[in-house]
Amino acid sequence: MTYPNLLDRFLTYVKVNTRSDEHSTTTPSTQSQVDFATNVLIPEMKRVGLQNVYYLPNGFAIGTLPANDPSLTRKIGFISHMDTADFNAEGVNPQVIENYDGCVIELGNSGFKLDPADFKSLEKYPGQTLITTDGTTLLGADDKSGIAEIMTAIEYLTAHPEIKHCEIRVGFGPDEEIGVGANKFDAEDFDVDFAYTVDGGPLGELQYETFSAAGAELHFQGRNVHPGTAKGQMVNALQLAIDFHNQLPENDRPELTEGYQGFYHLMDVTGSVEEARASYIIRDFEKDAFEARKASMQSIADKMNEELGSNRVTLNLTDQYYNMKEVIEKDMTPITIAKAVMEDLGITPIIEPIRGGTDGSKISFMGIPTPNIFAGGENMHGRFEYVSLQTMERAVDTIIGIVRSL
């Protein structure tokens, strides 16, 4: 089905810079997310028919579409995030490519291009309307496509009261991209039987397995002396960082893994001879493997300190989120419903693990099973991001279909 307001709604959203900031100590991490929620989303939530709309101190904009049939007693939620990834989001100037011809798309005057030779996903979209960047920013389809799709579905349900539905709760939250947005999610306030994040990628994605995730912060304390008299005295903190890294499995890196394979990912190294720091993320699907990875890093640090004769390597491990499969497999109802709806719509469900996480990874462990469905974005988190309008329309169809089926 086509939805006349979907494209304009999406274009309005992506033009607002809502980039999150991992170094911030506030919630949300950026004022722009607060402004987007209060000045753009909340007024529109009211316009499309949501009631009891409010903004919580945790950064979530919440609204309710009351049940229009008292016999439908379930309560369901739909959730998307407002923030965008750590890439330029100022001055987003989307291009709308109607009836895509399958050829190279020039991204404005930036010199960058979307070439099917480099991005095979483009081969799926001839004849469709694509929204791209101009090559200077990301697009923000992750996850403003999800917000636009949820908003459009609510608008449609409000305009069609003949579609009987249970109570629907909507939540638009902050800081998903930096992994902290759902930390303060109020599950008791949201109060639904189950929910869906609309935060997936291509058509048909239906996901209930995520990584379990941890962060590792390492501090290496060296001892700097003049290199001319360094023998037996100098301890080079940068060399300690190298030595630590070289003891991790050589092939357990993101660029060498896929499917259910986990990894260690070195994100950042800074320092000098005197002092160095390194940041890693740790990812795996199975709980035992996840715990083993953390234990391995601690073992390396302990071994190095023993060999050095002092505690020059300090490791701080922080769990970030866990594989929501552990929760959702106890009751697969949300998956069964979404899968059946997609199949009825002629969409082939793609049920595979997310090599990442969603807000649902945390919300599921708060007592609300929250799998993830597609929102349409491709090549997310950078200048090559794009989305198909037709896929977005199918996401709206899926949301409405889920509501109809309850």
From Swiss-Prot:
Q: Give the record's cofactor note, including how many are bound.
A: Binds 2 Zn(2+) ions per subunit.
Provide the cofactor list for this protein. Zn(2+)
Localization in the cell = Cytoplasm
Q: Which BP terms does GO give this entry? A: peptide catabolic process; proteolysis
**Reactions catalysed according to its record:** Release of the N-terminal residue from a tripeptide
Superkingdom of the source species: Bacteria
Which Pfam families does the entry mention?
M20_dimer (PF07687), Peptidase_M20 (PF01546)
Give the EC number: 3.4.11.4
Q: Does the keyword Hydrolase apply?
A: yes
Q: Which InterPro entries match?
A: ArgE/DapE_CS (IPR001261), Bact_exopeptidase_dim_dom (IPR036264), Peptidase_M20 (IPR002933), Peptidase_M20_dimer (IPR011650), Peptidase_M20B (IPR010161)
Q: Which class of enzymes does this protein belong to? A: hydrolase
Listed GO molecular functions?
A: metallopeptidase activity; tripeptide aminopeptidase activity; zinc ion binding
One GO cellular component term noted in the UniProt record for this chain: cytosol
Sites binding Zn(2+) 1 sit at 81, 142, 199
The protein's role, per its UniProt record: Cleaves the N-terminal amino acid of tripeptides.
Which family does the similarity line name?
Belongs to the peptidase M20B family.
User: What is the name listed in the Swiss-Prot or TrEMBL entry for this protein?
Assistant: Peptidase T
Which organism encodes this protein?
Answer: Streptococcus pneumoniae serotype 2 (strain D39 / NCTC 7466)
**Gene that encodes it:** pepT
